[in-house]
């Protein structure tokens, strides 16, 4: 202490030398506030940016500093706790170990941040084993929270004894606050944030990047609701909406169970429910007579999952027992309090605000990382420039170094601080003005680096460094480029770690459903051969005149091609018929909405498809908007020419695993499906340009498992390409499109009705120019066409832009394709107001040879 500093205590008496009078109420108030803020900011609440409390952040950083990564061996938990406590968190070891254990529990964390080995507790409330017995390391996804932390991406502060530094926040490559949630009790406030699905949260974050003005309702198109690690069900969408809209709410969580005749089997419990205590409470209620109708209760849970069996008494009503269990045990309430630290202050956040805080943090991280890398690259470019200059005058540089008295003298000479008058041959040597860093590197160069090969490598590296500098400057100077980097990195995390939802959202009377929050709009849905699927707004595609090239509609992975395109409303139910003869159902809005350049999402994440099973036909149930007394049928055709008709009533209860729609022969597959009313004419078109028209009454209605009857006689090398149903009130023409992009309209009357199983008539010429037929549709004057190529181009064009000609003709160019591309799919849709006038596109004139031989 300085000698002139005032003495606070009398050295003889120990009494304070100065006494300050204060009101005890004010002092207690201020001291309490200081204590409260210390607890709030330093212990109980997570940071909105990385979703971590200080203890969790310090544990992960201590593991990072000790090299305990996802690829290293597990380390004793006691060692991790000791390093955390000694270097960063001077609190009790039990508190640190409890925090470590929670990050390893897959029933507490949606995406565990610690990979534990040993007993870290259970859903029965068992405590973790002592820290000397368990081992741990970081999980792979935890490493993403610390990625690039060495690149000045976040602020560091001194640790508790000023001996080390620790991060104030982690870079956090994914929105951990929402993904893993958080809970804690501070002074006068608490937080309780539920976990969410990683893929949904990232999709919402990306949506916010592109639509900063979006609403909570818009974001809920991506984030359905909390996604608990223990699964179970959330009852009602309204409570979720309120919690996301205000930051506070109460969500009802219901166990998953199967009600059978003589038992109820519980397989999933509400989040944070102690299973052992639950079973005990049920037994107590049965003994007390609160719950009646139960004769036995068994916990058959094992490492494969939860299974609690409630055996019912003979004659007991399973629904009554179920309702009693729901009232007392199987349904709980999760109180959402989305409270987190924003700029060090506690704040209740809406869903949008939570994502915004994270997004701003990631922008800062990417900006700081880019600046850090830019500085490094500039330093490296400076060194390389010096080395290249030295190599250009290598003889003079070598002479200067050789004639210098020592290394420092040589460096000084290279910096131009003095002149080496002459070398051993008596010649004057030039002067240089290298910087200090350049001179140091030049003097340190080995003789082997003077070779021409080494010079080429330096030039290549210099060019590469300059390119990277330009890219980094673009990122730093262009907010859109910076956001693109943030989006790409988020998408990478999603593709690497996202999995399916575990918690289902079930509806309740009087609630706002998830569907209510989704705007009704027409969309374009694309499916690929590898069963990638996505939807895009119809407004993304402007109408062009025929002969245009269209615009990109999807990106494709290597080896994949487009299989089908169709237009639907977001609220439509779609039935997906597959190559195995199965049918599945899905709401259009459940298909992920993506950009035109995105690849899509694997359909196996939406439909439980078998290996090798492909979507071959899609039926929109909006086409079945009929009176109750009207019958409708699904009329199906296979590539070998079999046709069948089955009542739509047979498809009312479609399971998530699908149901059979048609039995198929060997090497046969379902090609097309149409909705008919029992009185329609059917047109079958083949790949080689034949077509047959007959009444659907020629095909009797059969069950789902039937194979059907022959619809057309095919040549040995021919196959059915499409099925069209004639609507006399709306359809005027038959539209035929070939794989090389040619097509035509022909009056329906030119296709005379025949008997089923005939050879048919020539519909279109399938020569080298046209290629094979890929689609046959019945169309009206108000329709427009959506054509998609195998490589992902989409053309939207009016049907009346296509010439009306006879049957046995060549047709005109409809879509201009690359030489290696072909038409994959065609769909028709009633023309909308925004498509009434087509763009000129790249359309060709009508002077092509639209007619050829006279129809036979």
From Swiss-Prot:
Region span, Disordered? 822-856
Q: Name one Pfam family in it.
A: DNA_gyraseA_C
Q: Which residues form the active site?
A: 133 (o-(5'-phospho-dna)-tyrosine intermediate)
Question: What's the superkingdom here?
Answer: Archaea
* Biological process according to GO: DNA topological change; DNA-templated DNA replication
Q: Which reaction does it catalyse?
A: ATP-dependent breakage, passage and rejoining of double-stranded DNA
The Gene Ontology CC terms held by the record are: chromosome; cytoplasm; DNA topoisomerase type II (double strand cut, ATP-hydrolyzing) complex
Which Enzyme Commission number(s) are listed?
5.6.2.2
Sequence motif GyrA-box, location on chain: 544-550
The biased composition feature labelled Acidic residues covers 835-847
The record's listing under InterPro entries reads: GyrA, GyrA/parC_rep, Gyrase/topoIV_suA_C, Topo_IIA-like_dom_sf, Topo_IIA_A/C_ab, Topo_IIA_A_a_sf, Topo_IIA_dom_A, Type_II_DNA_Topoisomerases
Keywords attached to this Swiss-Prot or TrEMBL record, sorted alphabetically, are: ATP-binding, Cytoplasm, DNA-binding, Isomerase, Nucleotide-binding, Topoisomerase
Q: Where in the cell is it found?
A: Cytoplasm
Q: Which residues form the Topo IIA-type catalytic domain?
A: 45-517
The record's PROSITE patterns line, in alphabetical order, gives:
TOPO_IIA
Q: Can you tell me which family this protein belongs to?
A: Belongs to the type II topoisomerase GyrA/ParC subunit family.
> Whom does it interact with, and what assembly results?
Heterotetramer, composed of two GyrA and two GyrB chains. In the heterotetramer, GyrA contains the active site tyrosine that forms a transient covalent intermediate with DNA, while GyrB binds cofactors and catalyzes ATP hydrolysis.
Name of the protein described by the UniProt record: DNA gyrase subunit A
What is the species listed in this Swiss-Prot or TrEMBL entry?
Haloquadratum walsbyi (strain DSM 16790 / HBSQ001)
Print the organism lineage: Archaea, Methanobacteriati, Methanobacteriota, Stenosarchaea group, Halobacteria
